[in-house]
Curated annotation (Swiss-Prot):
This is Pescadillo homolog. Component of the NOP7 complex, composed of ERB1, NOP7 and YTM1. The complex is held together by ERB1, which interacts with NOP7 via its N-terminal domain and with YTM1 via a high-affinity interaction between the seven-bladed beta-propeller domains of the 2 proteins. The NOP7 complex associates with the 66S pre-ribosome. Also interacts with NOG1. May also associate with the origin recognition complex (ORC complex). Pfam families: BRCT_2 (PF16589), Pescadillo_N (PF06732). Present with 4530 molecules/cell in log phase SD medium. The modification Phosphothreonine is found at T308. Residues 294-342, 530-605 form a coiled coil. Belongs to the pescadillo family. It is found in: Nucleus, Nucleolus; Nucleus, Nucleoplasm. Keywords: Coiled coil, Nucleus, Phosphoprotein, Ribosome biogenesis, rRNA processing. The modification Phosphoserine is found at S288. The lineage of its organism: Eukaryota, Fungi, Dikarya, Ascomycota, Saccharomycotina. Residues 355-449 form the BRCT domain. It comes from Saccharomyces cerevisiae (strain ATCC 204508 / S288c) (Baker's yeast). Component of the NOP7 complex, which is required for maturation of the 25S and 5.8S ribosomal RNAs and formation of the 60S ribosome. Residues 313-327, 575-584 have a biased composition (Basic and acidic residues).
Amino acid sequence: MRIKKKNTRGNARNFITRSQAVRKLQVSLADFRRLCIFKGIYPREPRNKKKANKGSTAPTTFYYAKDIQYLMHEPVLAKFREHKTFARKLTRALGRGEVSSAKRLEENRDSYTLDHIIKERYPSFPDAIRDIDDALNMLFLFSNLPSTNQVSSKIINDAQKICNQWLAYVAKERLVRKVFVSIKGVYYQANIKGEEVRWLVPFKFPENIPSDVDFRIMLTFLEFYSTLLHFVLYKLYTDSGLIYPPKLDLKKDKIISGLSSYILESRQEDSLLKLDPTEIEEDVKVESLDASTLKSALNADEANTDETEKEEEQEKKQEKEQEKEQNEETELDTFEDNNKNKGDILIQPSKYDSPVASLFSAFVFYVSREVPIDILEFLILSCGGNVISEAAMDQIENKKDIDMSKVTHQIVDRPVLKNKVAGRTYIQPQWIFDCINKGELVPANKYLPGEALPPHLSPWGDAIGYDPTAPVEEGEEEESESESESEDQVEEEDQEVVAGEEDDDDDEELQAQKELELEAQGIKYSETSEADKDVNKSKNKKRKVDEEEEEKKLKMIMMSNKQKKLYKKMKYSNAKKEEQAENLKKKKKQIAKQKAKLNKLDSKK
């Protein structure tokens, strides 16, 4: 019998520690982390850590051995090793004072690309769109950061550029479906090629960068995500027939940098412009050759030209006469439709699938300077509306060119307005958000300047939980009190029923005697029968509850430990949600009571 070697099977073979992986790949720990981020390899948790670590109980990080073997054939790994030798040569040249050789090394420095990794990790385009949420969140985060020693201004500008290109595409194709303004920032949801994409855009406030953040790891993720977004944007722009990257209008960018400063050109128009000059040149060359040959032919055949011209004229006359005769023969009667009631006219299908895409197509919005233009401009343009910004108008020289008579809505975030223009609807910014979330135009009465706004709810909230928009019923408290009293009565009756179940036989024997006694006292038998019915109802209710509990217990017995834990977690979370909903309902009732009291006092005054 062969003796089995230790640590050659199972967890010891399938897992490898981080220090072993770094030693095997012959790279530094920082390069190993970067490589794992690029390739999407993460630490794993073995079932038996002691066996995986070959008997040791020291806390370590484990990876799959196959993943590390897969990393050994990565081209980026070779580039990391080349960079290591380059850094060694550069430090040696600088130490010796050889500036020219250091410059030459810097100019010939090798660079790596992540294109092949993107293709490996996302073999199809829908896969890339499904994983684009984290990429957008990271890029929008960096686009709002201030430039520091750790994060250069070039990185921030590149992130801003990619973010604006993404927003410009979404607004152009009108793909926004949901929006929610929270404490963290603004959440957007768009439908990209049938996939729901949700991302967070932070508010443009000055950020205080914490000192404990490891920017090396974050910048590695940013490098990968920016490459991924370049791929995705190129595909989206080309599928829509647009040129990528879009051009930037420098004049508009200087006035106010926004989506309006991007020029989205069609690829078809551009291709036609490129093809026209070549086609014109070819036509000119052909015409010049034909003219030279014709001159020589005319000089040679001057005598025959007159005869040929006469014959051609006669043939043309004959053809015209034949055509007239045919038209006279084939003329048909014309029938006019005298019916005033026309048939049903079919509504032509819209270019856009969702009603949100053309929600503001008939409106022109004038955004006041106190309102954040970047949020509202993106939402209004993606719903088909037009935007005029007061902040941008302050910097424009020729204000007369802008037609302000077309403005239908003015978005204001002030409590009181002194001067109002007739014909405009004055609203607060929340009107835009609620219209998009509901998919229809909401009445503007509740959103007038200075009005108390309705609650701004998350469109991705739990449908089972508390609904703040539900009206408060006046008799809810009385019902709850009566319900609690009835429950107490039912419990008392149940206890009596349980005690009476033991001696049912005695009750049957004494029933006749009770009836006789009641008749002697003058009490009707029908009253006692109604009381018995109530008792029977409560008895049936209790039986149903007991049966349901027994069924649940039996199902729990048949479950595995994993399923039992999951079921308990679900029960706990549902109970918590119900408790929170009840607390919020109670608060709402109290607020409604206080408002009613205040209204009564105001009416008395």
